[in-house]
């Protein structure tokens, strides 16, 4: 999948789930399940409930996403 096909949204982490998954409420009031990107895991960036984040989603499945950035 190329980079152009990815949709990016901002959201807020509402709940921490098992297996490093998170429930995220997007700006447009949709709720999705997201996991952290590998680069965030490698650099040990912590994501907690209430954090504002950037999520990448594929247009094929709009219920799952990947957390790519945590705002400061």
UniProtKB/Swiss-Prot annotation:
One of its GO terms (molecular function) is translation initiation factor activity. It holds the Pfam family eIF-1a. It is found in: Cytoplasm. GO terms for cellular component: cytosol. Keywords: Cytoplasm, Initiation factor, Protein biosynthesis, RNA-binding, rRNA-binding. Residues 1-72 form the S1-like domain. InterPro entries: NA-bd_OB-fold, RNA-binding_domain_S1_IF1, TIF_IF1. The keyword RNA-binding applies. Belongs to the IF-1 family. Component of the 30S ribosomal translation pre-initiation complex which assembles on the 30S ribosome in the order IF-2 and IF-3, IF-1 and N-formylmethionyl-tRNA(fMet); mRNA recruitment can occur at any time during PIC assembly. One of the essential components for the initiation of protein synthesis. Stabilizes the binding of IF-2 and IF-3 on the 30S subunit to which N-formylmethionyl-tRNA(fMet) subsequently binds. Helps modulate mRNA selection, yielding the 30S pre-initiation complex (PIC). Upon addition of the 50S ribosomal subunit IF-1, IF-2 and IF-3 are released leaving the mature 70S translation initiation complex. This is Translation initiation factor IF-1. It comes from Bartonella quintana (strain Toulouse).
């Amino acid at each position: 999948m190329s980079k152009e096909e990815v949709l990016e949204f901002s959201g807020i982490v509402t709940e921490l789930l098992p297996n490093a998954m998170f429930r995220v409420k997007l700006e447009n009031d949709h709720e999705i399940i997201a996991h952290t990107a590998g680069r965030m895991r490698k650099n040990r960036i912590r994501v907690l409930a209430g954090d504002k984040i950037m999520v990448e989603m594929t247009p094929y499945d709009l219920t799952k996403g990947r957390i790519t950035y945590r705002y400061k």
